[in-house]
Amino acid sequence: MSYGVKCPKCGLMQLPGPQCKSCGTALGGPARPAGPARPAAPPRPQTPPPAPLPSDTNHSPGFSPPVPSGLEAGPGEGRQLFFYGSGGSLFGIHIVNMFLTVVTLGIYYFWAKVRVRQYLLSETEFEGDRFAYHGTAKELLLGFLKAALVFGVPLLLLGILQGILASVPVVKALLGLLTYAIVMVLIPFAIVGARRYRLSRTSWREIRFSFRGRALDFIKLFVTGSLLSGITLGLYYPFFDTRRHEFLVAHSYFGNQKFDFDGKGRDLFGSFLVVMLFFVPTLGLVWFWYQAKKQRYFWGHTSLATARFHSTVTGTRLFLLTVGNLFLLVATLGLGFPWALVRNVRFALRYLTLDGPLDLSSIRQEAQAATATGEALAGFFDAGLDLG
């Protein structure tokens, strides 16, 4: 019985023979009886191990090479906005604002609003950089005085005339219709003016936002949509709401880059019918479900260049936020307002991402002029939905 031998060079186990079958090294064993031996094979060249890539050196196993500047994220990767403010810090600002507003008989209100907006934006971060607010209290004060003079005085005079001519029903009714018509025009004017001002005073990486829509176009859209919503007993509302949102988004810019919106009101019509049918049976709770769905739809159809927004908010989360804020305000007799405001901002950002590639390096600043008159009107009619 013969035993196998191991080649001293390549380590191959084989039957005894004069040389290794693999590398041809002499084994010193007896020759095999079968056939002539094969010629010795040349030794295999020794290949050096591959050199590591530059991005693999001096890094931990989980290291990912940096994304090239400009795109900063690839398809499927979401960019998140973060808010680092706290209710306690905002409470300190809020208390001082309240005290100075009372002492100055309301004049400090404009400085108070600027301080809150500066705090909220400076604590909001995107891609490692904070936002900034550049509005001033002087602008807000002058805008308020201008709005009060141009629009407030005529409305006040109409109200006085209604009181004086109350005994003449026809004249009183006509004055009432005139007042309503003026307000219906001023509300969209205020919305556009406020958005134009606020975006023009907001920047990120020293590039400002802007709004370039014409007030007259939005007034036509708003008045027509309001009338059709009333005539159709509310059935036109999702179409009107979507067109209004489209106008405000599609005319907004970040530097020279335009935002886009491609949503359609018909996509929300079915959900709105559900709200109308179940609003009373659910004691209005179905409205939270609709608002969450609308937010997801609106954000999902909003894009900036090649990147698209994505929201994961749900009706349950929105309901819990509202109930929590209501309890907080009632339990603290209103002193918990700063914490409620911080909760709202964090909630708005927590479920929102910007997905897809975006070449931020190609965005350039484009100056746009804006006044605070519309901002003041938005305050009159409570038409603005800003955070401060």
Language model features with spans:
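Low-complexity, intrinsically disordered extramembrane tails and loops of integral membrane proteins
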Residues: 1-83, 354-388
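Membrane-interface extramembranous regions at the lipid-water interface
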Residues: 53-96, 111-146, 193-224, 240-273, ...
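Hydrophobic, aromatic-rich membrane-embedded alpha-helical segments
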Residues: 94-115, 222-242, 273-291, 326-343
